[in-house]
Amino acid sequence: MKLYSLSVLYKGDNKVSLLKSAYDVSSFSFFQRSSIQEFMAFTSQLIVERSDKGSRSSVKEQEYLCHVYVRNDSLAGVVIADNEYPPRVCFTLLEKVLEEFSTQVDRIDWPSGSPATIQYNALDSYLSKYQNPRDADPMSKVQAELDETKIILHNTMESLLQRGEKLDDLVSKSEVLGTQSKAFYKTARKQNSCCGIM
């Protein structure tokens, strides 16, 4: 999972202006980096130009996804990531960056702004912080912990059963479980197995 670009743009009536951007092109060859960076800037501007105000969307280009958020006030953000990176985290990042940008940079400067004139330097740190979505996004972290717990729980159940022993056999031999509990287990087992691939 990787983020390659984070950009803030202004969608004017006739033209889209790049206000500020940050890039991580370290995974590309040295000689390709400047061309790739230019292409990302061009793609970001093109996507914002063709998006409506007040919209969020994702555009797939080969193994990359471009996530765009254009606010009603014409401020826009674009994240370019690989297709494994969670879109929800990208849109959370865009919302956070655009909100912070709009409070730190005066709205009057947006239409005429450029990367050289806009004083906002947080994009590089956001791009680096959000490289790992689990660290940056609390929901992703919780989801990863839940997945880990499920795996541990599954492994623990398998290790509790002796070699060749099945949970079905233990349930049927159990003296602790009542007939109703055994029937419930068998019904649940049948319902869960009906959808499995045989």
From Swiss-Prot:
Q: Localized where? A: Cytoplasm, Cytosol; Cytoplasmic vesicle membrane; Golgi apparatus membrane
Keywords, A to Z, come to: Coiled coil, Cytoplasm, Cytoplasmic vesicle, ER-Golgi transport, Golgi apparatus, Lipoprotein, Membrane, Methylation, Palmitate, Prenylation, Protein transport, Transferase, Transport
Q: Which GO terms describe its cellular component?
A: cytoplasmic vesicle membrane; cytosol; Golgi membrane
EC number of this enzyme: 2.3.1.-
- UniProt modified residues of type Cysteine methyl ester: 195
SMART domains tied to this protein:
Longin (SM01270)
> What are the residue ranges of the propeptide?
196-198
- What protein name is recorded for this chain? Synaptobrevin homolog YKT6
Q: Which organism is it from?
A: Xenopus tropicalis (Western clawed frog)
Q: Which gene encodes it?
A: ykt6
